[in-house]
Amino acid sequence: MSRINKFVLTVSLLIFIMISAVACGIYTQMVKERVYSLKQSVIDTAFAVANIAEYRRSVAIDLINTLNPTEEQLLVGLRTAYADSVSPSYLYDVGPYLISSDECIQVKEFEKNYCADIMQVVKYRHVKNTGFISFDGKTFVYYLYPVTHNRSLIFLLGLERFSLLSKSLAMDSENLMFSLFKNGKPVTGDEYNAKNAIFTVSEAMEHFAYLPTGLYVFAYKKDVYLRVCTLIIFFAALVAVISGASCLYLVRRVINRGIVEKEAIINNHFERVLDGGLFFSAADVKKLYSMYNSAFLDDLTKAMGRKSFDEDLKALPEKGGYLCLFDVDKFKNINDTFGHLLGDEVLMKVVKILKSQIPVDKGKVYRFGGDEFAVIYTGGTLEELLSILKEIVHFQVGSINLSTSIGVAHSNECTTVERLKMLADERLYKSKKNGRAQISWQ
């Protein structure tokens, strides 16, 4: 695995871990808050029920203080008051009842009478208290409030309704669990199993006088929590994969662009990046181009220099091609007769002619110094090369006729580059010996 792939994999893994941890952490905190909100809903529900029960008691007390009624008159007054102010159906299932030490009277006339059951269960009939009472296979929370020294009102609320009302006030109620235990046995609420619950909170609630005594258990459904966390992890993995693939694509594009720019500069194709690139600005490219020219090009003729020649000559046996060595005939006499300025013009003219004839991908022109030149030709036949070289055998600069002597050798003729260079030099000498202004290749 390459360093790039390892880097991208590490980044993707970090993205996955970060998203999973943060998202699951936020979701976990939300679930815990919902469990605590359910606990608060139970407290608020009980408080609301107690307040309404207290209000009903105050109605009875107002009747007593205002009219000082008999028991029959009190009962009629209560029934009239409750007829004018119907109790909320979502709160009360049964009652209220007016009880004393030895008597229980049903306030509402058209309900089933549970007085006998109430008198058997409720022991403290003249002290404000709450508790549980069961009859007809149902369990109720009762709220008992004294209205006189020997009479009290008792209100009943079905535990199932109490549980539903409490959960309806909490968010995400369908996934919350609420159970009430009395003496270790479940009284109401959801069927609680520790294996199926998570973030369980339990409290006796003894410090709330308006709540029936018991163990209140609140929790969240474990399967729902795990399912949501699994979805979060899957989403995090998907984001990590997409991010990793995108990162890998971009990194590879950047690297490939860098390779293109590097090869363009190394191979002297500065025109491809002359306007700047991803890694090199236009100013950088121009500076590199200038440095390249100084190191590899002849300042006067812009032919390749000795360093480039040595490198390309080493590669010639593998590529296969021709080495040509040549110089300008009687160049010293030209300098002495017409001066160095004309001599420079002659040298530049020779290089210009060859560059115009040799395709860039087939060969290069080199200058060693003075009037000594070379051509390495790797892209064509001997006939094509001779056709090109004939352009400089005879040429003119102004009105002056000039010529060159050339020696040509093929890489297949020698086993080493040193011997190849010697063979081309021998054929150059042969051209000079035979009268100059000619090409020798045999």
From Swiss-Prot:
Its EC number is 2.7.7.65. Its cofactor is Mg(2+). InterPro entries: Diguanylate_Cyclase, GAPES2, GGDEF_dom, Nucleotide_cyclase, Rev_trsase/Diguanyl_cyclase. A lipid is attached at C24 (N-palmitoyl cysteine). Coiled coil: none annotated. A lipid is attached at C24 (S-diacylglycerol cysteine). Residues 1-23 form the signal peptide. Catalyzes the synthesis of cyclic-di-GMP (c-di-GMP) via the condensation of 2 GTP molecules. This is Probable diguanylate cyclase DgcI. It comes from Escherichia coli O157:H7.
